[in-house]
């Protein structure tokens, strides 16, 4: 078994790490200062020039749209990096060290998932209208799936209606946690809803493209995540009231929503988990540096046995999560979503919980400082904790893993 990265991946890792050192880490202070200045000026939901100024540099460095896998690149007609999931995974980890950096490389959610969805399932006209400007970074997008009135962890509960009327579809419903909808550059929503309530359970839902600004589409409010609003990106509550779009905006056809979701969410979960591993790596680095410098009870905090135990445990947890995630990425490359289903569920359980624990230990080592925004740890923890819900809660993935495991033995069971 070869655990080494390909020469192509190593080259991109080196170039990406160099870009982070030269441009991203030095810009962290400017990023937060710009948000503070925009907030004071009443312009909190304004695109950040700190990020916009770095995008041309990322493009010039050949570090643009790295997420787009081989099959989606071919479908989109985009001649980019064309990486496999396994090749992209370590790059996502590097970007994850600074939570906003993936946007610099046009590799941030939900745009990545939306671009892959349109590339794979959209018509040629939809690709021309939406995919091209998304790949160029000229517009942003949102993904509307979760609903406030039902337990959306069971996606068959989704109640938003998408009804055919002549040459159009009319959409009615309410969504929340619609990430990306707060950005004024958000030009398009991919929305999941019910087209046929009488169809079999997993054939009732469809996905459809909804241009922002369509009559009846209203962004109701921004939702805070443990006090953070993630402006200017945002997680919004959105109302669809008799929103009418052309029938050609349906993706893949009626009743194919779950099929699309599986194709979309698998790579997205790998991206999220690898970014979390990068976030946890940075938290461990900060923990080690802080513990080595601070003295309590006559010796460095790093000399305390409890601190050493946590550092060792953090290293073990991070490396285990990374290996499992890379395995899931490799399995997806060779066999697709269904082949990697169990491993993807496992990483979605393991990586967020690991990151929460490692970041929590790092916060503890920072004392009171770990709880404030003088350090990135509190915000990092919120991000990691959110991903125990986003793209499916822990409980759903644990149930899936357990069913697969029990299935190995149920066929052999005999009545007593």
Locations of regions flagged by a protein language model:
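N-terminal glycine-rich flavin-associated loop
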Residues: 105-125, 154
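Flexible, small-/acidic-enriched active-site or ligand-binding loops
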Residues: 157, 215-244
């Amino acid at each position: 078994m070869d655990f080494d990265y390909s020469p192509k991946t190593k080259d991109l890792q080196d170039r990406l790490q160099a870009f982070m050192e030269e441009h991203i880490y030095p810009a962290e202070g400017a990023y937060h200062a710009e948000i503070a200045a925009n907030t004071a000026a009443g312009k909190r939901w304004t695109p950040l020039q700190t990020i916009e100024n770095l995008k041309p540099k990322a493009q010039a460095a050949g570090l643009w749209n790295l997420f787009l896998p081989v099959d989606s690149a071919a479908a989109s007609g985009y001649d980019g990096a064309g990486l496999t999931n396994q090749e992209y995974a370590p790059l996502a980890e590097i970007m994850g060290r600074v939570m906003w950096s993936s946007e610099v490389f046009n590799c941030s959610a939900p745009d990545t998932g939306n671009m892959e969805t349109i590339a794979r399932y959209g018509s040629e006209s939809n690709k021309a209208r939406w995919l091209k400007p998304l790949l160029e970074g000229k517009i942003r997008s949102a993904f509307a799936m979760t609903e406030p009135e039902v337990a959306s962890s069971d996606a068959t509960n989704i109640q938003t209606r998408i009804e055919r009327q002549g040459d159009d579809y009319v959409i009615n419903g309410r969504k929340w946690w619609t990430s990306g909808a707060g950005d004024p550059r958000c030009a398009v929503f991919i929305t999941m809803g019910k087209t046929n309530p009488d169809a079999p359970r997993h054939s009732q839902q469809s996905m459809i493209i909804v241009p922002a600004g369509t009559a009846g589409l209203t962004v109701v409010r921004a939702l805070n995540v443990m006090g953070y609003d993630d402006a200017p990106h945002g997680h919004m509550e959105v109302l669809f009231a008799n929103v009418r779009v052309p029938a050609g905006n349906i993706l893949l056809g009626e009743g194919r929503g779950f099929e699309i979701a599986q194709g979309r969410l698998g790579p997205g979960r790998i991206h999220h988990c690898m970014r979390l591993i990068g976030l946890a790596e940075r938290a461990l680095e900060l923990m080690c540096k802080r513990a080595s410098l601070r003295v309590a009870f006559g010796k460095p905090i790093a000399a305390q046995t409890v601190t050493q135990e946590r550092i060792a445990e953090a290293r073990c947890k991070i490396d285990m999560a990374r290996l499992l995630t890379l395995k899931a990425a490799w399995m997806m490359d060779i066999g697709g979503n269904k082949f990697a289903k169990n491993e993807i569920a496992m990483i979605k359980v393991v990586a967020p919980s690991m990151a929460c624990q490692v970041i929590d230990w790092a916060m503890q080592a920072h004392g009171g400082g770990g709880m404030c925004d003088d350090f990135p740890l509190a915000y990092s923890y919120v991000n990691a904790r959110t991903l125990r819900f986003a793209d499916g809660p822990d409980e759903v993935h644990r149930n899936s893993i357990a069913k697969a495991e029990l299935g190995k033995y149920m066929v052999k069971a005999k009545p007593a």
